């Protein structure tokens, strides 16, 4: 038994599917203590959009530490905090015509979500938060209440209240108008659904299976929430910071949410940091009404600001992300077309959040396991883990993209058999389905 097995809780997940000991990482490559190399198409579940140990950020961080720059500051004023706020305003908000106050709720995405829901309830005086089928918003109890995943919800140990799930875009299939259903519930006094305080939505459901909301659906949702006086919260924890192309995942739709949550890659270097962006008229907090010990980690301010300057002062990263995403989509479409018809593989995604849906979680997991054996990291997502998901760093090179696609193609062929054969009768090992 290793020290990990001896000391760590049974709750650990990723290490079960990737049973190696990592030691170093650079860009989109990770290396084990034994020197084995792995191509990373996981990127810390979206926390490493700029890759591991990004050279443009690393030296700034090292220099800051060596000069004894402030590390922990709660919400005290610091030079690092000022620089981040000014850079975020100049590089992100002003060019997009967005007017948000910035709240630092704590170190992680669930902190940002909790703050958003608390504020929606505070300003409206209502209780319920509406979320969508297959949503994932975090592991704290409030965030779990608006999460669809039964395994995650079960970890709470008691019923989760004050939340209502409605169908996400495409959930009912075909041409079904899921927002018409939602609005019918709101308009019908006999539906049993009260007007909610807020609606929380992911424009692309990452953990839910790379389910993509169309721009038209998002615009209809924005219109619906405006007409009913409901606070619209966009959870951009995983899909923000350029994952879908634009800095915010909602940019393509043209909507302006009332509240936006950011975390994961907002710190630039993989350091913990979260933001809750809110329209000024919603900033009705009393001083200290929501706080947290680790809401002022200056090294994350430092690398977060530098990442904004390096990658968001022009449109180069966005264009590169969209181009690489289209290349992945092209190959995934070929893989789906090459598979036996009964497999009915479905390709999903936007930008560099891409996936292939398989008929079962066993198959999707087996593909991820085969890729790991070939030296590549990727995971499954969705109900039952049926979607093979890739979230490579936005800075991944074209050569690394092609290497990863070749591994995926070979892994799918290994698991499904040749393009003309039915799935082999051999038992496929059940994978561990993990989530961030």
Each language-model region and where it sits:
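Conserved N-terminal phosphate-binding loop of PLP-dependent enzymes in the Aspartate aminotransferase
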Residues: 1-436
């Amino acid at each position: 038994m290793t020290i990990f097995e001896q000391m760590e809780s049974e709750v650990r997940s990723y290490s079960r599917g990737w049973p190696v000991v990592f030691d170093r990482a650079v860009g989109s490559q990770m290396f084990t203590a034994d020197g084995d190399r792995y191509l990373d198409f996981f990127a810390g579940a979206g926390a490493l959009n700029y890759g591991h140990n990004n050279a443009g950020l690393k030296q700034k961080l090292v220099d800051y530490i060596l000069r004894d720059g402030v590390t922990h500051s709660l919400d005290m004023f610091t030079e690092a905090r000022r620089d981040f706020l000014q850079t975020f305003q100049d590089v992100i908000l002003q060019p997009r015509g967005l007017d948000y106050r910035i709240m630092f709720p704590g170190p992680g995405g669930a902190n940002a979500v909790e703050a958003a829901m608390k504020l929606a309830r505070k300003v409206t005086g209502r209780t319920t938060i509406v979320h969508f089928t297959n949503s994932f918003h975090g592991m704290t109890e409030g965030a779990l209440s608006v999460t669809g995943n039964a395994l995650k919800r079960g970890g709470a140990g008691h019923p989760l209240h004050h939340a209502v799930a409605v169908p996400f875009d495409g959930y009912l299939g075909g041409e079904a108008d899921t927002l018409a259903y939602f609005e019918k519930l709101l308009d019908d006094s006999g539906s049993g659904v009260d007007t909610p305080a807020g609606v929380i939505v992911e424009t692309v459901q990452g953990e839910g299976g790379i389910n993509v909301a169309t721009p038209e659906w998002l615009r209809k949702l924005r219109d619906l929430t405006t007409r009913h006086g409901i606070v619209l919260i966009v959870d951009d924890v995983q899909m923000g910071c350029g994952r879908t192309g634009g800095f915010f995942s909602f940019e393509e739709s043209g909507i302006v949410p009332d509240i936006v949550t950011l975390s994961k890659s907002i710190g630039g270097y993989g350091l913990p940091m979260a933001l809750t962006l809110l329209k000024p008229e919603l900033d009705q907090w009393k001083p200290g009404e929501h706080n947290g010990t680790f809401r002022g980690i200056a090294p994350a301010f430092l690398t977060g600001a530098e990442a904004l300057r390096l990658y968001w002062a022009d449109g180069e990263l966005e264009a590169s992300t969209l181009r690489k995403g289209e290349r992945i989509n092209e190959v995934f479409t070929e893989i789906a077309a090459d598979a036996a018809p009964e497999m009915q593989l479905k390709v999903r995604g936007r930008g560099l959040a891409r996936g292939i849906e398989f008929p079962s979680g066993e198959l999707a997991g087996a593909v991820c396991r085969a890729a790991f054996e070939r030296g590549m990291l990727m995971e499954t997502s969705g109900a039952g883990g049926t979607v093979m998901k890739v979230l490579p760093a936005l800075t991944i090179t074209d050569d690394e993209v092609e290497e990863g696609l070749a591994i995926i193609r070979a892994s799918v062929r290994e698991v499904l058999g040749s393009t003309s054969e039915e799935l082999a009768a051999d038992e496929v090992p059940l994978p561990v389905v993990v989530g961030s």
